[in-house]
From Swiss-Prot:
EC number per UniProt: 3.1.-.-
Signal peptide: none
Subcellular location as annotated: Cytoplasm
Predominant location category: cytoplasm
Pfam family, one: RuvX
GO cellular component: cytosol
SUPFAM superfamilies hit by this protein: Ribonuclease H-like
EC class: hydrolase
Name of the protein this chain belongs to: Putative pre-16S rRNA nuclease
HAMAP family documented for this protein: Nuclease_YqgF
InterPro entries on file: RNaseH-like_sf (IPR012337), YqgF (IPR005227), YqgF/RNaseH-like_dom (IPR006641), YqgF/RNaseH-like_dom_sf (IPR037027)
Amino acid sequence: MAAAGSIMAFDFGTRSIGVAIGQRVTCTARPLTAFKARDGVPDWQQIEKLLKEWRPETVVVGLPLNMDGSEQPLTARVRKFANRMHGRFGVQVVLHDERLSTVEARAGLFERGGYRALEKGKVDAGSAVIILESWLEQFPE
């Protein structure tokens, strides 16, 4: 399933982690999945499976910041997640500002499907899409 120039994104949360895949060529992304985390501990086997299947050249992890750009309590956990992903799997991992990605994902899902579309997994995977598309716009090459 891997294609040259594929990029994977993660929207890290303490209960759920959204995942998206995208392409540099088209600068587009689509949701892949969301999976549960236990108090911020991800299912590393699930991540390994996704990385082996898609073989992304880069992994983008959304970095939660306050609106003024300062860090929040979750920021350190996201940095730890990104560092562990790099250490475990040897993939290139970059952090990207994710401010308002969940708000934007919820609004888009609601617009397309009302309240029924606002399932947690869909919101998290949708947030990963927004994070990835934002990163692709900022770093197209």
